[in-house]
Amino acid sequence: MSQGYSEKVKELLDSVGAAFFDRVKIKLADGLVLEGLLMPRPAFGDPDVVVLKLDNGYNIGISLQRIVSVELLEKFSPREAPTPGEEEGSQEDFGQPEPRVFFVGTGGTIASRVDYVTGAVYPYFTAEELYSMIPELKRLARISSETLFSIFSEDMTPSHWQQLASKIGEIFRRESDVKGVVVAHGTDTLHYSAAAMAFAVQEAPGPIVFVGAQRSSDRPSSDAALNVIGATVVAVHAPFAESVIAMHGSVNDDTILVHRGVRARKMHTSRRDAFMSINSKPIAEVDPLRGSLKLSTSTYKGRGDDVVVQASFSDKVALVKFYPGMSPDIFDFYLEKGFKGLVIEGTGLGHVSTALIDSVRRLVREGVFVAMASQCIFGRVNMNVYRTGVELIKAGVVPAGDMIPETAYVKLSWILGQTEDPEEIQRLFTANLAFEISERSEFDHYPGARW
């Protein structure tokens, strides 16, 4: 049982017969007494720290130096991790609400849970498991589900976007009564995938709703259940058929905000309300307790009868952030490696060092499409104000307007998957295909008054 722990910790735990997942009581030098499940130690960290799962769901680390005694309270009784449909309550008659929603699992915190009886981490994504974990879904929709991937979101590639778009198209064509598709996804690159579906799935009978979780389902502060409820409400009730993200709108469990995939960005590493609409407002707001949806706009792509999917993406596109002292060799590298498109995150209104302009000009001359977005995130590129911007335009750089850099990257990847014609590439990139570009910037689209 000592895997990951030091010999001193092993000696202490072995002396009382304690093993992983046994219930133990630990008395500390300051008189504090803690009870919980003895957990394996993470791969990284101090081997002299004992990890305990408290009854409130949180894990804590206890330094060996603070421990006075360990008492074994209850031995772990091993059992196999439940297979889909075997969990308690999974055979319950959930009733047959009229709407039907299809869940697609791709991995991430939202689509897995920890079984602390076995210690195993495994996907929960059958309809029965979703109902068991989130009973409120029973009154909202009939759930069908399928796991397409089980990967970390940072491992997503344009090839995965292609497979996901094809799967969503297949679901809408095959399941004529499905009101919407909910995609469970890791949060770190969720906005990339949501933007990709906005371009690839061009017509659909219902929305594609991306949902994730900042906190795992075994934590008391988990946002998973409420986010899934909100996403389901959107899939059932939204009048639009767009690719959107449904996540917490505040740190409280009161509101789910619905962001267009092409306008959303993860703006915090860990807050439950990490996602924000950039240069735009959320398209809708959900009250997850009432199961109601309130639209914030009258302009959207409505539900239709057809399913149109153009799923090809190019993997020869890069997103490059400019920084002071950046070497021209970086652009030369992409040219040598055969890249067909480059989105530069420039400073301010869309600038890079004048020392880079010749390299950029060479990229364009060799047939590489080069676009400019701003690393400011909010606001829009305007390369006609300063000489550097004007020189970049003369070199052939195409401004990305007020597109988020990540969206510009995804859009260019999708465009280069459709055509190699330079004029068509530029026409598509500068066109507003999925509400990713605004004609003008609105004053209240910047959250400067949040403090």
UniProtKB/Swiss-Prot annotation:
Top-level taxon of origin: Archaea
EC number of this enzyme: 6.3.5.-
Molecular-function GO terms, alphabetical: asparaginase activity; ATP binding; glutaminyl-tRNA synthase (glutamine-hydrolyzing) activity
Domain Asparaginase/glutaminase: 99-432
CDD domains reported for this sequence: GatD (cd08962)
Cited Gene3D superfamilies: 2.30.30.520, 3.40.50.40, L-asparaginase, N-terminal domain (3.40.50.1170)
Active site (record annotation): 109, 187, 188, 266
Stored SMART domains: Asparaginase
Region entry Disordered, spans: 78-97
UniProt keywords, alphabetically: ATP-binding, Ligase, Nucleotide-binding, Protein biosynthesis
Listed GO biological process terms: amino acid metabolic process; regulation of translational fidelity; translation
Family assignment from sequence similarity: Belongs to the asparaginase 1 family. GatD subfamily.
HAMAP family linked to this entry: GatD (MF_00586)
The protein's role, per its UniProt record: Allows the formation of correctly charged Gln-tRNA(Gln) through the transamidation of misacylated Glu-tRNA(Gln) in organisms which lack glutaminyl-tRNA synthetase. The reaction takes place in the presence of glutamine and ATP through an activated gamma-phospho-Glu-tRNA(Gln). The GatDE system is specific for glutamate and does not act on aspartate.
NCBIfam families the record matches: asnASE_I, gatD_arch, PRK04183.1
PANTHER family listed in its UniProt record: 60 KDA LYSOPHOSPHOLIPASE, L-ASPARAGINASE
Subunit structure: Heterodimer of GatD and GatE.
Protein name per the record: Glutamyl-tRNA(Gln) amidotransferase subunit D
Native organism: Thermofilum pendens (strain DSM 2475 / Hrk 5)
Source lineage: Archaea, Thermoproteota, Thermoprotei, Thermofilales, Thermofilaceae
